[in-house]
Amino acid sequence: MSCVTRAPMSVPQTALQPNSYVNFDAQQTSSTLLPVEVIDSVMQYLPAHDVIQSSFASYPLTLIANKIIRARLSFLDEYSLRVFAKDVYTDSPICNLSARRGLYSLQYDGYSVFHLDPNNCSSIFQISFEDDEDLASFERYPGEFLAPHINVRIHVTLSRSSCDRHQADIFSCFQDPIRVRRDWLDSIKPGQPETLWFDQNTQHVIGLIVTRVDAAPGKYDLSVTSVIVQTEYLLSCLEKRVH
């Protein structure tokens, strides 16, 4: 992974004068404005959404926190989230797609939504198997066998193309095998969106929004519409990468 220069993610110091107030939304003149010291603190210690909500309940902080977070993430508009997956055993590709950050969506509150690039070569996450022997058995504890699944290795990176067309990665969001259960695949109804979480049964920080487009036995073609990443996780990864 190549090193990149940190993108500016803070409010210019010339805009912050001692004992002054910053109006983040001129149209909301009735809203109480935050002291610049609080704004500096939030800018320095993101993610701070929960902290400022509990500590300064008298201010319209949800609005201001969201504005600050969106400002910190705005530079990502130049980047793509690239997702590559392959079957662990057959080594065959399952998906290869890229997505760009879209507008904030109330439907996925707390997540940054990356919509597939219009020029993306494929939007399909394809899993297939011939019979049960193609599915891996998994025993978490002695005598406890979990539902049949397919082992898939997912690699997600946040990167952009430089002028010489080389990829400049900010960081790898995820690079681990996941177990895709057959019963979960069978439960997906065509045309109904579902979320395929990469960190199943944990915190749900990265996932694909998918719909099933093929109901043939042993074949699952999932159409990917977007990738969602927990905003707090994304900010945390960025802070670790640039410091």
UniProtKB/Swiss-Prot annotation:
Membrane-traversing stretches: none
Pathway, per Swiss-Prot/TrEMBL? Protein modification; protein ubiquitination
| Name under which the protein is recorded | F-box protein pof15
Signal peptide (UniProt feature, chain positions): none
Output the Gene Ontology cellular-component terms: ubiquitin ligase complex
State its role: Probable substrate recognition component of a SCF (SKP1-CUL1-F-box protein) E3 ubiquitin-protein ligase complex that mediates the ubiquitination and subsequent proteasomal degradation of target proteins.
Q: Which GO terms describe its molecular function?
A: ubiquitin-like ligase-substrate adaptor activity
4Fe-4S in keyword set: no
**What organism is listed for this UniProt entry?**
Schizosaccharomyces pombe (strain 972 / ATCC 24843)
